[in-house]
Amino acid sequence: MLDRSNELTAWDRDHFFHPSTHMGGHARGETPTRVVAGGEGVYITDTTGRKSLDAFAGLYCVNVGYGRQKIADAIAAQAKNLAYYHAYVGHGTEASIKLTKMIIDRAPAGMSRVYFGLSGSDANETNIKLIWYYNNILGRPEKKKIISRWRGYHGSGVMTGSLTGLALFHNAFDLPRAPVLHTEAPYYFRRPDQSMSEEQFSQYCADKLEEMIIAEGPETVAAFIGEPILGTGGIVPPPKTYWQKIQAVLDKYDILLVADEVVTGFGRLGTMFGSDHYGMKPDLITIAKGLTSAYAPLSGTIVSNKMWQVLVQGSDQMGAIGHGWTYSAHPICAAAGIANLELIDELGIVENAGTTGTYFRSELEKAVAGHRNVGEVRGDGLMAAVEFVDDKDDRKFFDAGRKIGPQVASALLERGVIGRAMPQGDILGFAPPLCLTREEADIVVKAAADAIETVFKSI
């Protein structure tokens, strides 16, 4: 293959506006760039021929792994037969209708309909509009506030960026905007009182939520949104009984629950949905990444029976609902989704995420938890994180300017493995494809241990 990497890199730095990237550093050539050319299984290869084990599945999304011919063939066949038709005013395609049925068959109990978008961000925008519409139809125009959590990630639009509880996505964007509020993150490692048990900390979080609701006025609070396990905020599993205690508060004040399952949906935690894994009872579920394993852009809002009945009432009163995207239920993306869900079933991907995930976290903990600068190894399913601390006893943060997380991620990449330096705190995250084998997990663990040892020897 002709090596065009230098030419492509030059074009990249001259013309490509990358997401979540230091713009000046990239344009000036001060930060690394990489042109990815291919992928197979859990590996990607760049234009220089360098191969890396992708232990973050792109962005938590390539669940079935790279190079699945079945999905590629489904996309090609759909493009040849019918590349596009819209879904407005009752139009559908065989692919979009079949995929809807497949999603509902796999969804938690009580779910009714699927509205399709293209990204998790636009799906959460849809959720907010539906929540407001729902309360207007019920004659509660003042019930509009949405409570999210610090460290949560729900997108990077205006409203979804407001829902996100990470400074990177607020800085200089005039975010967050009303009517979004943020409450305590269920971050047990960073609990305010180290003597708290998990159950006590869960109660503390629920009490903080209830205090906020009472202070704002329950009649003004419409919904609470949360990822089953915090993802971009640090891969933080909820402490024991957290979701049960949160649900009790929401039920008490008639507040809807949105489960943002963009990351956890379709197997990541060893169950089809994270809501089932943690016993959540959502009114809306956000889906995206695992729906197509990122072979095509597709997201969705799964609507509960409870909400659907009110939405129907709204159409009977006001006519057609004024919400839609040109590419909603795009048939090519839907075809990718069908093939992907079939592969998940055929390959036993969900079960593998549970068993291999348990093995991976156990081996990772054995390998690095004893290091003087490792504060915690945590995770669930095929999600794991290593949090670094300057002082293990008092869990002291490193100075942010030292960029410990990025240093470890860079050292890991030098050893042929991709992890992610999470955007807030010195945390190295892992979320590999759900087809990861134990042998591949061992490769990740060894590389991580070597990278951590090397970085901390030099500081």
Identify the function of each model-found stretch:
Residues 1-459:
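Conserved N-terminal phosphate-binding loop of PLP-dependent enzymes in the Aspartate aminotransferase
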